[in-house]
Amino acid sequence: MSVKTLTQTALQKLTTNAQVIEEDGLGPKVLHLVDDSFLKLFRQRRWYTSGSFTPYSERFAVNSERLRHIGIPTPQILDLYRIKDGSSAVHYLPLPGNTLRQVLQGITAPDVREALVQRFGKFMAQLHEQGVYFRSLHLGNVLVLEDGEFGLIDVADMRIYPSSLSLSLRQRNLRHMQRYTVDRRWLFEDHFQALLQGYAMTASKSAVDTLHKQVMAAGLAARANG
């Protein structure tokens, strides 16, 4: 997909009456436009990162297309932009659904929540077996779609390998998810056996055993520090 230049005037016109979904101290980061599409802004980095060579907007678009190619729903990319101030942006149609975190928060029956966690375990294994290393994987970046399937959002920080992930990369992925208090309780405490059962539907026994040992070790360390 070609990258278009977006002037400040055109940006202001595009975002007129838009709803700010996410912002930081420098301004809006994600905007819900009046036509129900979204615009995600990536500001120029002041230090070296891989995004200095390949803008995060382009990585977002490339990863979205590659994921869709292997059957994982992601936002549909409409346009890519470079802005005169050095920022970049991606214009896309959102996936219809709610984050897995929101859905789990709304479930009151433990058995229903457990079944959903098991399904997520299978989905996570699918990502790992297909070589998807989503560095920012957490329950706020996984959507439960209207048909009940899972999709991914905010996919700029990702690498897709030609073969299944190594055990070390799977461990790093889990460590990232363990940083989120609510996610950790649902996935690795309350419904950990369900998560393992789902993961085992697709992943190898060695991968399942590695996941189990890592979570158990983290639990022991937390209790020791407590």
PLM region descriptions:
Residues G131, S136, D154:
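Conserved catalytic-loop position in the HRD/HxD motif
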Residues L137-V144:
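Hydrophobic residue at the +6 position relative to the catalytic HRD Asp in the kinase catalytic loop
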Residues L100-A109:
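AlphaC helix of the protein kinase catalytic domain
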Residues Q8-T99, R119-Q130:
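Conserved ATP-binding subdomain of kinase catalytic cores across diverse folds
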Residues R113-V117:
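Short alpha-helical scaffold element within the canonical Hanks-type protein kinase domain
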Residues G151-G226:
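C-lobe/activation-segment region of protein kinase-like
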Residues M1-Q19, A218-R223:
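Juxta-kinase regulatory segment immediately upstream of eukaryotic protein kinase catalytic domains
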Residues A89-P94, E149-V155:
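A short beta-strand motif that forms the metal-chelation/ATP-contact edge
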